[in-house]
């Protein structure tokens, strides 16, 4: 069974939950002079990421950077484990998320309170990342991917107060994390178009900030979204 598919411009979509590539969380690999992973999912997705890298003949040692749009566990819970396996990689995250990736104790405690007996199955292990391997990214920062290609980062709050998006200069696509909503390709509106619902996470949902993030994304000369 394949856990990835090539989308465009050497961007691969990775299944972060085995067997649910089209209907569940996704991560992305940008393959090129620099190999970049965007989103890690929770640690149980680790084996499918490594399997995909092996199939594509990319060594974990060849991963240059791992980017998380925000630190919610379905997007970044497996970052510590994957960083151990990608020894050359730098982890990129918004400044407000840095301390929780270097010391995830609060993330673990909060998840255990919510998921209780299901915590181990869904998220274990959540491992700390050495501070020296974490680089913070803020509004307007860029990452050179080589060959004239770059990612530009923007703060996009509303779902979380540390959420960023990345705009790819080559594909003209936005890696949107959760701020563009939850995409349902099997649910359609009256015109037959797929529907995306706002992702209103508890505690940090801010409708005004989310609307501002929508305006930001609409202002970019984008051709597609990578949910």
Please provide the spans of the model-predicted regions.
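Conserved beta-strand hairpin/beta-sheet module of binuclear metal-dependent hydrolase folds
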Residues: 2-56, 166-176
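Metallo-beta-lactamase
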Residues: 6, 42, 62-74, 99-157, 161-226
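Structural motif
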Residues: 36, 62-65, 171-173, 224
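Active-site environment of divalent metal-dependent phosphoester hydrolases
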Residues: 45, 71-76, 99-100, 161-163, ...
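Metal-dependent catalytic neighborhoods of phosphoester/phosphodiester hydrolases
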Residues: 77-86, 104
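Short internal beta-strands
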Residues: 90-96
């Amino acid at each position: 069974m394949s856990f990835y598919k090539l989308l465009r411009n050497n961007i691969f979509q990775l299944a972060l939950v085995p067997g649910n590539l089209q209907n569940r969380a996704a991560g992305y690999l940008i393959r090129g002079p620099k190999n970049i992973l965007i989103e890690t999912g929770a640690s149980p997705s680790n084996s499918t990421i490594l399997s995909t890298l092996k199939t594509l003949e990319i060594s974990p040692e060849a991963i240059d950077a791992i980017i998380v749009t925000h630190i919610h566990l379905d997007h970044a819970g497996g970052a510590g484990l994957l960083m151990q396996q990608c020894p050359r990689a730098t982890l990129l995250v918004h400044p407000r998320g840095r301390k929780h990736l270097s010391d995830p104790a609060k993330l673990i405690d909060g998840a255990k309170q919510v998921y209780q007996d299901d915590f181990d199955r869904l998220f274990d292990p959540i491992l700390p990342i050495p501070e020296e391997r974490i680089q913070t990214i803020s509004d307007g920062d860029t990452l050179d991917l080589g060959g004239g290609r770059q990612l530009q980062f923007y703060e996009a709050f509303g779902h979380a107060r540390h959420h960023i998006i990345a705009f790819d200069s080559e594909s003209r696509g936005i890696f949107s994390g959760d701020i563009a909503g939850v995409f349902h390709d099997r649910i359609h509106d009256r015109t037959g178009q797929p529907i995306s619902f706002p992702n209103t996470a508890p505690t940090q949902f801010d409708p005004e900030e989310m609307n501002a993030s929508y305006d930001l994304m609409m202002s970019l000369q984008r051709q597609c979204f990578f949910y």
